[in-house]
């Protein structure tokens, strides 16, 4: 089904691209759906899932148009001009999505029943904590993952921010979290992620070398399995990390979590080759998405804010995190930042405090904070 969904996506995308390139017109989802109802790929995908595939293609095109509009106004914010939605690989797969009118959730035994029209009579064990929206099958290299999409109510987070925690993301220290309630900062060790990536890179290089020598190929099903296992291990590590952070916030009555983010982190990385490889292979966006939905589910206000100039300005000297104050040479040795008065502070803790200061300038005072600047290092499993 995912193969037919891919074929439908490419066929419809071809029609849209040709119409746009030759005539400058865009065909709406409704017209495309009407036109493709008689096509073989539409029938093989089944009408309801085919609708979902065409809707997703329509969404991708509308994102392209929004991107072009934003690029014309502020081209400096982009790495280049947005490109037309691409075709999927000929031998690839695309998610196959079934809407809720073709699926029934049975809360008494925690299963989802998919219409017999699509597959044999079978109940899938799952967890659905709200109104079922969609069931989708996602291709993941050597296997398929079934995802349950549901809608649930979330608590209101519009209240005043009083108890605040701020996070600075890194490599050796995956997460450095500070707060304004007088508790020691927390550092979540990033060595677990580095270990997963190092093992994956070593195994991948060995298998690719043997594959090239024996069969003259660059990729195989075995490499798909290795890559999927690496993805699952990292996803689990990120879930454990986000789970620990949110639970800590709940236990300490934190009502607002601020996370430092740079949209051009990986494009502009200037680290040495080894450090850069570790940095590029850490899926920070996965962690941010998990933190966002987990915070929203428990009523914690979640804020992402750009972190520029936070690593080279001094919290202890009460400097504003702006370009005029930026001086990264004050990071005198690995992991330490020296203030103007000679006090030493963990550089990631300094960055985290400056991130908090960017969003909430009066959330925390520099005076008397030295007593709670020694971070507690945590390892998640």
Region spans (language model):
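Nucleic-acid substrate recognition interfaces
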Residues: 1-381
């Amino acid at each position: 089904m995912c193969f037919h969904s891919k074929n439908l996506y490419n066929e419809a995308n071809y029609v849209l691209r040709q119409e746009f390139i030759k005539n400058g017109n865009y065909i709406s989802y409704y017209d495309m759906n009407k036109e493709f109802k008689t096509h073989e790929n539409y029938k093989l995908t089944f009408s309801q899932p085919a609708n979902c595939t065409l809707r997703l293609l329509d969404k991708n095109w509308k994102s392209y148009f929004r991107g072009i509009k934003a690029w014309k106004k502020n081209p400096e914010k982009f790495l280049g001009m947005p490109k037309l939605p691409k075709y999927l690989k000929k031998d690839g797969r695309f998610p196959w999505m079934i809407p809720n009118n073709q699926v029934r959730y049975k809360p008494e035994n925690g299963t989802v029943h998919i219409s017999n029209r699509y597959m044999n009579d079978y109940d899938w064990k799952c967890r659905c904590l709200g109104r079922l929206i969609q069931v989708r099958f996602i291709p993941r290299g050597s296997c398929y993952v079934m995802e349950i999409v549901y809608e649930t109510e979330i608590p209101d987070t519009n209240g005043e921010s009083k108890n605040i925690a701020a996070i600075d993301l890194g490599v050796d220290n995956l997460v450095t979290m500070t707060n304004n309630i007088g508790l020691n900062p927390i550092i979540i060790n990033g060595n677990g992620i580095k270990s997963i990536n190092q093992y994956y890179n070593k195994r991948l290089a060995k298998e690719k070398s043997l594959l090239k020598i024996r069969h003259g190929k660059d990729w195989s099903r075995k490499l798909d399995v290795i890559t999927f296992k690496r993805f699952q291990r990292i996803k689990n590590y990120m879930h454990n990390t986000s789970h620990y952070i949110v639970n800590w916030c709940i236990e300490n009555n934190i009502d607002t979590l601020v996370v430092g983010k740079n949209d051009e982190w990986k494009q502009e990385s200037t680290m040495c080759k080894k450090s850069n490889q570790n940095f590029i292979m850490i899926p920070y966006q996965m962690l941010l998405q998990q933190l966002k939905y987990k915070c929203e589910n428990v009523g914690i206000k979640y804020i992402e804010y750009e972190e520029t100039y936070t690593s080279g300005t001094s919290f202890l000297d009460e400097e504003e995190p702006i370009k005029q104050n930026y001086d990264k040479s004050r990071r005198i040795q690995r992991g330490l930042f020296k203030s103007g008065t000679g006090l030493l502070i963990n550089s990631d803790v300094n960055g985290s405090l400056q991130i908090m200061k960017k969003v909430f300038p009066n959330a925390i005072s520099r005076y008397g904070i030295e007593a709670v600047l020694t971070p507690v290092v945590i390892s998640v499993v």
